[in-house]
């Protein structure tokens, strides 16, 4: 009997991607996050679709429609909390996925890495426009502040900002188009994910040792499907604990007040997953300089393959590179903390030092560490 899984044109694609896929035998739990991100994206699209059925993208009714979802729609509170906290889980998995890529040298698979960085930027854009939709105080002022950054672009800045707004300030037209963007972008993300996986199929997965794993591979199913299922259980446990016990702990209390253009909140700040970039933005007194540093903090990932100087693919065996990597991790946590603090001393100077160290680590120190490791490997006789 012919095995349909291996011959059917559609099932064959699924089979080669998730069942008979040859995977390195030594990949650790750090390789779980790809599948977890797929689950997060699915949760976000499904919950978002149900929320869109009840949401109205009008400045007069947006806030009350979100309240209506939470109070009157069957399980609306659950769908809304899953969507809001699902975004936090999505970014947590994203940051860990990128961190694993840096630690184990996955950025050497350039096409997969570059599509991944584009995916990161697209997800960040989607999350930003989504945060504006409830039309609370922080939604409105966050949108005003971030879109205002466009006006820092020389010559065309003001025109560009007004074009995005659809008027002379953040208003009804802005909310309507942000809802349109927030609806369409997840489907663009899905298409990019397929391209990401396509490039990954070309090279095969990386592995902790950084050594070519072709000599020792095992089928993805059942070994890694079981392993991913365990990761999925942990993800759902954390997400449901957050949603059912403390759904508003990661949000901002100001967003429980309807948007008021005449009343500025004491401290405008985005969601926690943007705080590191927000701190870098604030660390430079010049508006254009801050915007460029903000963009550079993400786009710097694109040049990582060119900054790779060591002969080793992975940091697994190199204590110097490992130390710098964990300093970078601690530095990003510090920047996240600073981003949530008011713009005053001593937070300003801490933010400036952490921002400088962020770029210094990636551009110079990690590059020098690679050269030092190469030197240490050379025979001395």
Swiss-Prot record:
The chain crosses the membrane at residues 33-53, 77-98, 113-133, 178-198, 226-246, 288-308, 320-340, 347-367. It is a multi-pass membrane protein. GO terms for cellular component: mitochondrial inner membrane; respiratory chain complex III. Heme b b566 binds at residues 97, 196. Heme b b562 binds at residues 83, 182. Gene3D superfamilies: Cytochrome Bc1 Complex, Chain C. CDD domains: cytochrome_b_C (cd00290), Cytochrome_b_N (cd00284). Keywords: Electron transport, Heme, Iron, Membrane, Metal-binding, Mitochondrion, Mitochondrion inner membrane, Respiratory chain, Transmembrane, Transmembrane helix, Transport, Ubiquinone. Binds 2 heme b groups non-covalently. InterPro entries: Cyt_b/b6_C, Cyt_b/b6_C_sf, Cyt_b/b6_N, Cytb/b6-like_sf, Cytochrome_b, Cytochrome_b_C_euk/bac, Cytochrome_b_N_euk/bac, Di-haem_cyt_TM. One of its GO terms (molecular function) is metal ion binding. Signal peptide: none annotated. The keyword Phosphoprotein does not apply. Its cofactor is heme b. It is found in: Mitochondrion inner membrane. GO terms for biological process: mitochondrial electron transport, ubiquinol to cytochrome c. Pfam families: Cytochrom_B_C, Cytochrome_B. The keyword Signal does not apply. Component of the ubiquinol-cytochrome c reductase complex (complex III or cytochrome b-c1 complex) that is part of the mitochondrial respiratory chain. The b-c1 complex mediates electron transfer from ubiquinol to cytochrome c. Contributes to the generation of a proton gradient across the mitochondrial membrane that is then used for ATP synthesis. The cytochrome bc1 complex contains 11 subunits: 3 respiratory subunits (MT-CYB, CYC1 and UQCRFS1), 2 core proteins (UQCRC1 and UQCRC2) and 6 low-molecular weight proteins (UQCRH/QCR6, UQCRB/QCR7, UQCRQ/QCR8, UQCR10/QCR9, UQCR11/QCR10 and a cleavage product of UQCRFS1). This cytochrome bc1 complex then forms a dimer. Heme 1 (or BL or b562) is low-potential and absorbs at about 562 nm, and heme 2 (or BH or b566) is high-potential and absorbs at about 566 nm. Belongs to the cytochrome b family. This is Cytochrome b. It comes from Sminthopsis aitkeni (Kangaroo island dunnart).
